[in-house]
């Protein structure tokens, strides 16, 4: 496919700290990856000689750091599990797309402290993780949490004309996801030293007993779709916005992941140590239950808080794609108008969630992978 026929996925998470404040589900998903990170760090130490390692820094690389709010605990886990010699320098590297809010990331990193006394150096790497981002053989442990379901690029949907069916679009996305993961692992094989470790988690696709897809975070997704339909019917948005609005992500089934990991080029470079899936529930549900128990007479207030929390969580990821669709579908360039339309969509989505999904659990399946570099 020629570059002219594809659209790079260059929309970042919502900036200015909004994503940082609305990534609680990603935090819960990250906690499931900590045992894998500890195992990857321990295995890396067991397979390498400290005398040889001291010729270079001990390097940890995170792919898809966003604003860094879920970076500290994984890196701390690696450092506690690996414990480099006190004289060895440590290099922490944080990668995301060039459009990421690196200012917020840098600010968040300055507040972090680490459980070792080693000299620590930090780098920010603005580049697609579907390319090389670090020198060959320079990384000991790498990880990517809640990012790899975002595709590198997709064929854009035209504002006017025939719209591909869901089945056709999913088949295209599935093929792209397979190619993307192969590309990602190929680049990581260049960067990670033999004996090093790689831990991944990303949104997965659970299937029902008859093979049907179980929608992740079904309530907020349905609410935002209904809100957009309301805006279309009210004439606030043009049909072209609905045509081009799309989040270029693919939720892999566990079978999709195993198929990619079984490819010859992957087998040649990596030991597959662990692959599993797990359901993650947005932690706001637990807080909602605590609020209702503490103040049983304020049900409406609690429901509104919960709707705002889970909708804002979804918007932290998809708001940029909505703005992009309004720009492309309606030709709107005035930032005040864009902000106003986004605010209306968010408010309508909260209302729709309260109407049809009040206090529902927000659930998402994640796939977890631990690989060892041969």
From Swiss-Prot:
SUPFAM superfamilies: S-adenosyl-L-methionine-dependent methyltransferases. Disruption phenotype: Abolishes the production of acurin A. Induction: Expression is positively regulated by the acurin A cluster-specific transcription regulator acrR. GO terms for biological process: methylation. Its EC number is 2.1.1.-. Pathway: Secondary metabolite biosynthesis. Mg(2+) binds at residue 245. One of its GO terms (molecular function) is metal ion binding. Keywords: Magnesium, Metal-binding, Methyltransferase, S-adenosyl-L-methionine, Transferase. It comes from the Eukaryota. Pfam families: Methyltransf_7 (PF03492). The keyword S-adenosyl-L-methionine applies. S-adenosyl-L-homocysteine binds at residues 19, 70, 96, 128-129. Coiled coil: none annotated. The keyword Methyltransferase applies. Belongs to the methyltransferase superfamily. Type-7 methyltransferase family. O-methyltransferase; part of the cluster that mediates the biosynthesis of acurin A, a highly reduced polyketide coupled to a serine via a peptide bond. The activities of the highly reducing polyketide synthase acrA and the nonribosomal peptide synthetase acrB are collectively responsible for the synthesis of the acurin A core structure with a heptaketide backbone produced by acrA covalently fused to a L-serine by acrB. After the formation of the PK-NRP hybrid product, it is detached from acrB by reductive release to set up the formation of the lactam ring by aldol condensation. This is O-methyltransferase acrG. The gene is acrG.
């Amino acid at each position: 496919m020629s570059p002219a026929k594809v659209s790079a996925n260059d929309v970042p998470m919502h900036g200015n700290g909004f994503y940082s404040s609305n990534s609680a589900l990603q935090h819960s998903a990250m906690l499931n990856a900590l045992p894998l990170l500890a195992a990857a760090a321990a295995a890396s130490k067991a397979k390498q000689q400290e005398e040889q390692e001291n010729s270079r820094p001990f390097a940890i690389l995170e792919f898809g750091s966003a604003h860094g709010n879920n970076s500290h605990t994984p890196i701390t886990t690696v450092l506690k599990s690996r414990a480099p010699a006190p004289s060895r320098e440590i290099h922490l590297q944080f990668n995301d797309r060039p459009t990421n809010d690196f200012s917020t990331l840098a600010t968040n990193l300055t507040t972090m402290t680490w459980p070792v006394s080693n000299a620590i150096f930090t780098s920010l790497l603005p580049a697609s993780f579907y390319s090389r981002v670090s020198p060959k053989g320079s990384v000991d442990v790498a990880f990517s949490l809640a990012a790899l379901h975002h595709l590198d690029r997709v064929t854009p949907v035209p504002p006017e004309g025939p719209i591909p069916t869901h089945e056709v679009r999913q088949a295209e996305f599935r093929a792209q996801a397979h190619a993307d993961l192969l590309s990602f692992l190929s680049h990581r094989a260049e960067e990670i030293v033999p004996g090093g470790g790689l831990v991944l988690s990303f949104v997965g696709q659970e299937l029902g007993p008859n093979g049907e897809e179980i929608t992740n975070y079904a309530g907020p997704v349905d609410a935002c779709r209904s809100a957009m339909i309301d805006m279309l019917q009210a004439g606030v948005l043009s049909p072209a916005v609905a045509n081009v609005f799309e989040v270029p992500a693919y939720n892999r089934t566990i079978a999709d992941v195993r198929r990619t990991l079984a490819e010859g080029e992957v087998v040649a470079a990596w030991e597959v140590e662990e692959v599993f899936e797990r359901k993650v529930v947005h932690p706001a549900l637990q807080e909602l239950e605590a609020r209702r128990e503490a103040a049983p007479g304020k049900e409406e207030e609690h429901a509104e808080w919960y709707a705002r929390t889970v909708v804002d969580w979804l918007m932290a990821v998809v708001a940029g794609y909505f703005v992009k669709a309004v720009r492309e579908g309606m030709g709107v360039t005035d930032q005040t108008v864009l902000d106003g339309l986004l605010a209306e969509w968010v408010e309508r989505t909260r209302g729709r969630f309260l109407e049809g999904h009040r206090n529902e659990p927000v659930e998402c399946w994640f796939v977890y992978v631990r690989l060892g570099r041969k």
